[in-house]
């Protein structure tokens, strides 16, 4: 991906929130899209972010932000069937559509 393509991809995210979209939101989104589903621990290790940063970011990109505001609805969390205390993250239908549009750039 060249810089023009990167700019186009980032513009797709800017539409969601032109004034407030931390770069680690984009990083988390891209890792989840690439791996299909991941644990919080995997995201922490790959992106060198704290558990609280991952948790807040995933919530903001989910259905409801932690402060009760509507989220971006790009990610879904669900209990890991193999380990009930662990949560997995995957792209929502809206997130999959955005991921496909970025892949086509």
Describe the function of each predicted region:
Residues 69-84:
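Beta-hairpin "wing" of winged helix-turn-helix
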Residues 81-99:
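Basic, amphipathic "hinge/linker" alpha-helix immediately C-terminal to the N-terminal HTH DNA-binding motif
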Residues 13-50:
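N-terminal helix-turn-helix DNA-binding core of bacterial DNA-binding proteins
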Residues 9-13, 96-105:
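Amphipathic alpha-helical dimerization/coiled-coil segments
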Residues 2-18:
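Short, Lys/Arg-enriched N-terminal segment that forms or immediately precedes the first helix
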Residues 62-69:
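C-terminal flanking helix
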């Amino acid at each position: 991906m060249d810089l023009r393509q990167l700019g186009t991809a980032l513009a797709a995210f800017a539409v969601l929130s032109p004034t407030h979209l931390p770069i680690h939101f984009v990083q988390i989104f891209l890792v989840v899209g690439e791996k299909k589903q991941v644990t919080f621990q995997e995201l922490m290790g790959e992106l060198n972010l704290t558990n609280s940063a991952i948790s807040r970011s995933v919530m903001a990109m989910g259905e409801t932000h932690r402060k009760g505001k509507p989220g971006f609805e790009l990610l879904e969390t669900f209990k890991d069937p193999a380990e009930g205390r662990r949560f997995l993250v995957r792209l929502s239908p809206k997130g999959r559509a955005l991921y496909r549009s970025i892949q086509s750039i």
